[in-house]
Amino acid sequence: MSDDGDSAARPGEDWRPLAHQVAQSARDFIDGVAALARGEGGEETVPLLLLEVAQIQLTGAKLGASKDVILPGNWEPDVGADPDLDVLRTGLAARLEHGDEYAELFDPYADAKATAFRLSDDLATIAADLIHGLQHYEAGRSSEALWWWQYSYVNHWGLHGGAALRALHAVVAHARLDVAEDPAVS
């Protein structure tokens, strides 16, 4: 099911411009997070991760606000093996150290108890979903790519991104706002 514009997600609609924007955002996120996992962010790793996640969440929000992408068939072509993101995951875990694990209500409407999550897992999960869509996009199947990115944003990586965004924001906020208690004042 090749998509050079002839296979629109809905009759009469051209999804290629949005697919191009999402593909560029996905590449930027993957490249940025990979650089940070390699240690290129130094002491600014957490604020830079906050920026990366905020930017990809904006892209996801555009997908969530768009009409549903409907494929003409009810199947998704195979894109090959899932990427091995262990180097990314372990690199992020090493950079985040004690700030990697956090507690979250994954679904604030359904979950009554907080669950432990890891930022490194969340970011690798987001990257995996974005890469899956990029594999469709780079194979010339922009409709399938867009369908995948939209579906997986609503169902999977958007949830991980939202949780990671809150956790990263909390780390940045604590670093900037927490004041050590002055023993002379207490």
What kind of region is each of these model predictions?
Residues 63-107:
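Heme-based O2/NO sensor domains and their adjacent alpha-helical segments
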Residues 27-38, 54-65, 90-93, 97, ...:
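Alpha-helical repeat scaffolds in large eukaryotic proteins
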